[in-house]
Amino acid sequence: MRSRALFAGIGVLLAVFAADVLAAAEVRGVRLWRAPDNTRLVFDLSGPVQHSVFTLAAPNRIVIDISGAQLATKLEQLSLSNTPITSVRSAQRSPTELRVVIDVSAAVVPKSFSLAPNQQYGNRLVVDLFDQEAAANEASTPQVAVAPSTPQPPVSPTQPATNKLPPVPGGNRDIIIAIDAGHGGEDPGALGPKGQHEKDVTLAIAKELQRQINQEKGFRAELVRTGDYFIPLRKRTEIARKKGADLFVSIHADAAPSRSAFGASVFALSDRGATSETARWLADNENRSDLIGGVGSVSLDDKDRMLAGVLLDLSMTASLSSSLNVGQKVLTNISRVTPLHKRRVEQAGFMVLKSPDIPSILVETGFISNHNESQKLASAGHQQALARSIQGGIKQFFQQNPPPGTYIASQRDQGKIAAGPREHLVTSGESLALIAQRYQVSLAALRSANGLKNDNIKVGQTLDIPATALAAQP
């Protein structure tokens, strides 16, 4: 009887043991990316897990304990070049307790979080290893308010954004263009019919655009993303601001539900919602990048929060008007090298466009989901043509609206660059007096240039801005 009871007990234990093993999630893959200030590891899982992370010194190590998991891949296959990681090893402490040890050549600051499945990936565990200097800088940098409780004073469209680089002697600084290659790293963006990744196409076009802009005296282009790594959406505009950008240009090559969709588009921020169903779909899709790439507990599924973002107030009207202006010039130039999806600048709530002090545009270079366009977008020749057209529109805008203290402004003031006609697209909340003040022209001159009998203007109206210096207003 005792033997029978003993065997029965062992059988129960084995059954429980087997059930635990079957219930354990599998680590099916590990991916790694290096960014300028951190290294990201992504563990692809077959199901949700619990985890903890801690550090050890002498030697420096990061220990990741994953409960309810088994390793079903080889860690030795990871490419560790250009990272602080010297090796990655693991031990199955029990059938459902996995420990991963990351040996590092220098101390790092780990941050980790889990991500639920989405349309592209299953459950994931993300571990970011921040270089100590970058982590210290992040901790010491005050957080930027998302939505100020009181309106800020309007920002001139030709006035340099805050935190600019100090002007060079003589006030001849470069006009700085921040170029943001969409997606990257964990977030591949849209996929083409032959497996092309949007993140690769956008980076290639961004690098070509940087090369062409840097050939123009008085201009300097800075890449927001220089390689294949993920950057959260809000971080992209922060990087542009730190670089002292006068203009933020985000490059994309998106997909649409219909594979027949084709043509390039240019977007600016909308203060009243998307201007078309396609614009709304694209904005929703792009703004989910933070969910795909992972931004800790931040979720963009909440549409109210996503569309609220940085609320459009008085401080954004000048930036929005400049965005629409430069966007139209870029769109006109692009129409000479590729078909357009829409012949006017569209507006939608793209997160990367919500910067109150930097004019910003998003260029959809085409639909990578379209078979013909995906082939063109992968072509170096077409990428060069697209970059040339974007660069041309940017140059036209800044020759007409150079920020004070720049080389281009000094050349225009000396008569070496024709100022040319300036235009302003009226946006919600603007008055004729505010526009006159912004461009430093008199109300009388502004009325005369546009044949106005009074100060009444309409949203969407285009005003010609005269080159008259500010005179005493009547």
Regions found by a protein language model. Name each.
Residues A8-D20:
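Bacterial N-terminal signal peptides
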